[in-house]
A protein has these predicted regions:
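Conserved alpha-helical substructure of the radical SAM core
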Residues: 1-100, 104-107
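Exposed loop/turn and edge beta-strand positions of beta-sandwich/beta-sheet ligand-binding modules
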Residues: 4, 238, 292
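Flexible mid-to-C-terminal extensions adjoining Fe-S/redox cofactors in radical SAM and related proteins
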Residues: 257-361
Length: 361
């Protein structure tokens, strides 16, 4: 029986106005489900759920979300629960009931922090309290010994060596690891998204810099893992992971969220069983190696690259990853080393992302 890793935005509301938001349009007119629908879905499908990461919008704005966390922990303790928060968690748990649900029910926390500079982060997130909330939540997680990750956007605006050094210093101070999510143009490659799309050169330079100064502990990216580390990593999108939007829509990926990629809704009875037994996802996510990859040394390991990037840039899997620098005629003879680490994260194997650990003194 397949066990799914689920990313779930239970509500569409958010208290920030991020310049780069990948879900703003989708959340704008969302008809959100509520607690009864959430519980019904979990009750019917719990045997098929390995983990849940609660992401966009900001779940901590709704007390019912804390009730859901408590319900799942009490009834299905085998399901690992994680939260990605913009930092508002620290504000929400000033309520004792919410604090108890967090302490008892949440196994790990990702805190969004894109800049080590408070003013820059506040401007980037469109919220003057953004930096303070993030730091307060890091302190909260350290206090209650929750495994914590600083997650930062991989964009042309914030990926610099100076900012990387600052973020790693903050992570070290609070005993956290880090994770970089490459920016995705979910509403198309246009004048707005081009401001944030990170260049190949900037991205690879950042990875090489981090590998020398700190530790890369996991690289869940089919393209970059292949030619930077010589390791094969399968894209989990739609295979072991799915995304649930606030209106209950199910998609194969965090970033494939428009109508073209919706395959079902959690209000449908026994929906995870239905998805597994049908070809709903395999119609969208199927290993397709583009003809332009023929003869590449990484043709079978990379297999064309990351699914969501190919869809977002080109609308098809018949074209290779937009970050592919070209056909490799030989394998990398100086690969980046992935440092063995005992960390556990629901995001490791859930979506294409890269994890880091600050170097010890």
């Amino acid at each position: 029986m397949r066990k799914w890793n689920i990313g779930w935005g239970t509500i569409s509301h958010c208290n920030m106005n991020c310049q780069f938001c990948y879900s703003k349009y989708r959340r704008k007119n969302s008809k959100d489900l509520g607690y009864a629908d959430w519980v019904r879905f979990v009750d019917e499908n719990h045997e098929k759920i390995n983990s849940i990461n609660y992401g966009t919008g900001e779940n901590t704005l709704d007390e019912s979300w804390f009730d859901l966390v408590a319900y799942i922990r009490n009834h299905y303790p085998e399901i690992r629960q994680a939260l990605t928060t913009n930092g508002h968690l620290a504000e929400a748990v000033k309520d004792e009931k919410c604090l108890n649900a967090f302490i008892e029910g949440i196994d790990e926390v990702d805190v969004s922090l894109d800049f080590c500079d408070a003013q820059k982060h506040a401007e980037f997130r469109g919220q003057p309290e953004a930096y303070g909330w993030a730091i307060d939540t890091l302190a909260l997680c350290e206090k209650y010994k929750k495994p914590t990750t600083i997650v930062f956007l991989g964009s042309e605006k914030n990926v610099s060596r100076e900012n990387i050094d600052g973020l790693f210093s903050i992570a070290k101070e609070y005993g956290a690891i880090l994770r970089m999510n490459m920016y995705r143009p979910t509403e198309g490659v246009n004048d707005l998204s081009k401001q944030f799309i990170i260049s190949y050169e900037t991205f690879v330079d950042a990875l090489n810099y981090i590998a020398k100064q700190h530790h890369i502990i996991s690289m869940n990216d089919a393209l970059f893992s292949s030619f930077l580390t010589n390791e094969t990593v399968a894209d989990p999108s739609g295979d072991r992971s799915i995304r649930i939007l606030a209106d209950g829509s199910i998609t194969p990926s965090t970033y494939l969220i428009d109508e073209n990629y919706i395959v079902a809704n959690i209000t449908e009875p026994n929906v995870l069983d239905k998805i597994e037994k049908s070809n709903m996802l395999t119609n969208l996510i199927v290993k397709t190696i583009p003809s332009e990859c023929k003869g590449c040394a990484y043709e079978n390991s990379c297999a064309g690259g990351v699914y969501d990037r190919r869809y977002l840039w080109y609308g098809t899997l018949e074209k290779k990853d937009p970050y592919c620098p070209g056909v490799f005629h030989a394998r990398n003879n100086q690969p980046i080393e992935i440092t063995a680490s005992d960390f556990v994260s629901v995001h490791d194997g859930y979506l294409p992302t890269i994890f880091f650990r600050p170097k010890e003194d």
